[in-house]
Amino acid sequence: MWSARRINRGSSNFQELVVLSRGLGARRLTLVDRGLHGNPGKLLFYDLSREEPALLLVIWLRGVVFPEKPRSIKKPVAPLFVASAGGYLDFAEELAVALNYSYIGEVGSSGMSLTGRRLLLVEPVNKRNLAYVLKFLEDSRDLGLKILVKRFATRLRSSSPDGS
């Protein structure tokens, strides 16, 4: 994500965006669709490593919570890992694949030292209209940004808080 480049789609169609992304050396493409009042409503993750782009994951957002005290979040020195709270989560593994990062399972169960590492932690919530919270941690410290996930869908399955 820190190597990501933001491109204003403008009037470009999807194929033009794919060609542009590949020209920049991208292996993944993430599209942000608008929700209510222009806020992010949906994230679509595509794999560009094949001849035809493949949709890997769709995430419907409930919202984004920014830190109380705005500050810049610097690019991590070591690669980011995706981890889950409360056991193995299919969604966390699918998110790791979509972002092209490693999924290490439940926090603390991998035996790997996380000192100096940044994590994208997936916490299950399972409330009506809210399935997961994505948190960014560094050295077990919350960096403040939270992404609230309403539901998700992959090529293989979909999930929402009510089980549908």
Name each model-derived stretch.
Residues M1-S164:
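Phospho-regulatory, Ser/Thr- and acidic-rich intrinsically disordered linkers and terminal tails
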